[in-house]
Design a protein with these regions (language model features):
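N-terminal leader segment of winged-helix/HTH proteins
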Residues: 1-28
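Short helix-capping/hinge SLiMs at alpha-helix to coil transitions
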Residues: 27-28, 42-47
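Short, cationic-aromatic polyanion-contact patches
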Residues: 28, 33, 83-104
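A short acidic, leucine-rich amphipathic alpha-helix
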Residues: 53-56
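Short coil turns linking two alpha-helices in DNA-binding domains
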Residues: 61-62
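Glycine-centered, phosphate/nucleic-acid-interacting loop/turn motifs that mediate DNA/RNA or nucleotide
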Residues: 76
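Amphipathic alpha-helical dimerization/coiled-coil segments
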Residues: 98-144
Length: 180
């Protein structure tokens, strides 16, 4: 087993993580530590770090980091991994899932189903009362229909960027995934 050296974050890296924390708190109502963690994981070296290393780098408690990891895992944005012989998990950004990239249609399928449930309740109501649910259903179904095409467009665009040298090779896998 070999030790992994983790660099102390620079002021600029911590500022970036703080900016991510504010963005995710303001935009998505998440606890600032969730955004700070995601921002830091986007720039840290190595790309995967333990809960303790992340807590030390972000000057946060281990329990706050563990809670933020749980939130980001539920969103499909991070993944825990453990190298052979290690006793602790390492956390890194995971861009391998459709959900992490924003192309998972299930969120919108569930929204459409919920809106249709509301429409069934309001089956005899005037169109004005049903308007919000009708538009909600239409928008969700429209997104479900388009997401597969947008995902293919993104994959083609990403490959073009890689071919042009504007994106490095495969950035979708974590360090431990690459080692497998």
């Amino acid at each position: 087993m070999h030790a992994i050296v983790v660099a102390v974050p620079t002021d600029a890296e911590i500022t970036f993580a703080d900016h991510a924390g504010r963005l995710y708190a303001r935009r998505y109502g998440m606890a600032p530590v969730v955004g700070r963690l995601l921002g830091y994981l986007a720039i840290c070296d190595p790309r995967e770090q333990s809960i303790a290393e992340l807590a030390e780098a972000l000057l946060a408690s281990r329990s706050a980091i563990a809670g933020a990891v749980k939130t980001l895992e539920q969103l499909g944005l991070v993944r825990r991994s453990r190298a052979a012989g290690e006793r602790m998990d390492r956390v890194g950004i995971d861009l391998t899932s459709r959900r992490a990239l924003g192309f998972d249609p299930t969120e919108y399928q569930e929204q459409a189903a919920l809106a249709r449930e509301g429409l069934a309740i309001l089956a005899d109501a005037p169109p004005e009362r049903r308007a919000v649910l009708l538009e909600w259903t239409a928008m969700a179904e429209w997104l479900v229909a388009r997401l597969p095409e947008w995902e293919k467009d993104w994959q083609a665009h990403r490959e073009a960027l890689r071919a042009a040298g504007e994106l490095p090779g495969d950035t979708t896998h974590s360090d431990s995934e690459e080692a497998r």
